[in-house]
A protein has these predicted regions:
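Mg2+/Mn2+-dependent nuclease catalytic core
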Residues: 128-228
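Metal-dependent nuclease catalytic cores that hydrolyze phosphodiester bonds in DNA/RNA
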Residues: 2-161
Length: 228
């Protein structure tokens, strides 16, 4: 294998790469995000988290979106991030081909990780509003671009419908090591209403993108055991 010497072709390739970066920069500059600008005609980007902020505290939402006054941020837990990475890695190993033991055990052997060219973009929560290949939709009536980053999508091989999947981490075990019990996972806790709204929004976005999406989403809980 030989290295190609520097040539006019190399200069051309470098220029083309520079032009691509320039074009990408122009696209980014046209995006309407962060502080709301009434003079900007581009769709205003609102993530699922921002919508949740509006529902919890309209004054806080107004301060952040109009005056860029952000509330104190809670650092993310490394355990949660690691859980997502490992579960997605397992799904990628059989994506588009077969199910996973966890799903088989739950009686959902007909569910397989969905394969799609844009799935990696759909998982990108930082750049969800970049273009149509990312997980977003424009609500024409308000000129708002709603979106976010999803964890995964599974295909129901019986119905040919898609199901949005969200990965969660928790520790439901009791504190006492003597009489240790693990509480059953539930979505009925008051603070988990945001999980349900998140799922509803992601199903809505996916349907507006033209996909046959089921109204049933799945939450995959990883429960940390601290018995010993």
């Amino acid at each position: 294998m030989a290295l190609e010497p520097s040539s006019k072709r190399g200069v051309y390739e470098g220029k083309r790469y520079t032009d691509e970066l320039k074009n990408e920069g122009q696209k980014l500059s046209k995006r309407h995000r962060g502080r709301f600008d009434p003079m900007n005609e581009a769709p205003y980007e609102l993530s699922r988290g921002r919508v949740e902020n509006y529902l919890k505290c309209k004054a806080c939402f107004w301060l952040e979106q109009i005056h860029k006054v952000k509330p104190p941020e809670i650092p993310s837990f490394t355990l949660n991030t690691t859980t997502d990475i490992l579960l997605k890695r397992d799904a990628d190993a059989v994506r588009g081909r077969s199910t996973l033991p966890l799903w088989e055990k739950a009686g959902l052997g007909h569910m397989i990780p969905w394969q799609h060219d844009h799935l990696e973009n759909w998982a990108n929560s930082l750049h969800y509003g970049l273009n149509d290949t990312y997980f977003n939709t424009v609500h024409d009536e308000t000129n708002i671009k709603f979106g976010g980053g999803i964890d995964d999508v599974f295909l129901n091989t019986k119905t040919n419908q898609l199901h949005i999947v969200d990965y969660k981490s928790q520790a439901q075990g009791t504190r006492s090591p003597i009489k240790y019990e693990v509480k059953p996972s539930s979505l009925n806790d008051p603070w988990k209403i945001g999980y349900k709204r998140q799922m509803d929004m992601y199903i809505w976005v996916a349907r507006r993108k033209g996909f046959n999406v089921s109204g049933t989403g799945y939450f995959v809980y990883v429960d940390a055991q601290h018995k010993n």
